[in-house]
């Protein structure tokens, strides 16, 4: 998505929201025009939220520091699968140092979404060790059960632990036909090619509602498909088969 395309989208969505979340699937800090993208969002008065795997925090630190960003979510669990174990400590130290630097003006959510995965034990032990050291916390304090925003580590810094969930998969059959979801209730997603979908997990546009570049957002949200999906979730009913395969609703 180019900067001009992003600017066009911001103009289209601005009457509907004051919040923007720069993620669907992929790493937002990889965008070659990140600085300009953030400037456009900021100049339009949008509350900027970013979800990142944390691998580029050091490289992009100066860009992130110069902008007013409401919240940055750092998916620590991603490092377990994508970084060799001998580099976990360096990765975690960088992420925690970045969190401390940004915290005066930005909320930082450290995500550890793998709490039920037995294979993640050693990685999680390493994470909690680094966190207790960085924030001078005891193991007992770190093991407290929390909900919502998670455990407060310091001012504006939180640790959020959740089970790993299954992403929706159109090639699988699902039996969870009664569930609710945030889709179309408090958010939609717009993919890099302009396709509008109900939620941030539909990265392949399996439930395409429209195209932001050729249609008005108000018209897209009033399509029969969008209305049926939203009403379905309000009644805890799955309308789209792919939603029956999604595990995120178990976290709601």
Segments and roles (model prediction):
Residues 182-184:
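Short, small/polar residue-rich loop motifs at catalytic or cofactor-binding pockets
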Residues 190-191:
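Short, acidic, Ser/Thr-enriched surface-loop or helix-capping motifs
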Residues 34, 199-200:
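Active-site-flanking alpha-helical
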Residues 187:
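Short hydrophobic/aromatic beta-strand element in the GNAT-like acyltransferase core
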Residues 101-108, 133-176, 201-251:
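C-terminal accessory region of radical SAM enzymes
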Residues 1-143:
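Conserved glycine-rich "GG(E/T)P / GGGxP" loop and the immediately following alpha-helix
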């Amino acid at each position: 998505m180019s900067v001009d395309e992003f600017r066009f989208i911001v103009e289209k969505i601005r009457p509907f929201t004051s919040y923007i979340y720069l993620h669907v699937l992929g790493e937002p800090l990889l965008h070659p025009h990140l600085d300009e993208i953030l400037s456009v969002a900021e100049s339009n008065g949008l509350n900027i939220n970013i979800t990142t795997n944390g691998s580029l925090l050091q490289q992009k630190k100066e860009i992130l520091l110069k902008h007013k960003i409401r919240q940055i979510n750092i998916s620590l669990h991603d490092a377990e699968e994508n970084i060799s174990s001998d580099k976990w400590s360096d990765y975690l130290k960088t992420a925690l140092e970045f969190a401390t630097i940004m915290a005066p003006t930005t909320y930082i959510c450290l995500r550890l979404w793998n709490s039920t995965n037995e294979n993640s034990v050693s990685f999680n032990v390493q994470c909690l060790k680094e966190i207790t050291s960085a924030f001078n916390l005891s193991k007992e304090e770190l093991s407290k059960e929390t909900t919502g925003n998670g455990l407060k580590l310091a001012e504006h810094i939180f640790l959020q632990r959740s089970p790993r969930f299954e992403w929706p998969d159109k090639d699988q059959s699902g039996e969870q036909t009664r569930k609710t979801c945030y889709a179309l209730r408090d958010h939609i997603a717009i993919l890099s090619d302009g396709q509008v979908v109900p939620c941030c997990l539909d990265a392949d546009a399996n439930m395409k509602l429209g195209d932001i570049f050729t249609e008005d957002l108000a018209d897209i949200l009033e399509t029969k498909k969008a209305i049926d999906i939203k009403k379905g979730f309000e009644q805890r009913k799955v309308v789209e088969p792919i939603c029956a395969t999604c595990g995120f609703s178990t976290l709601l």
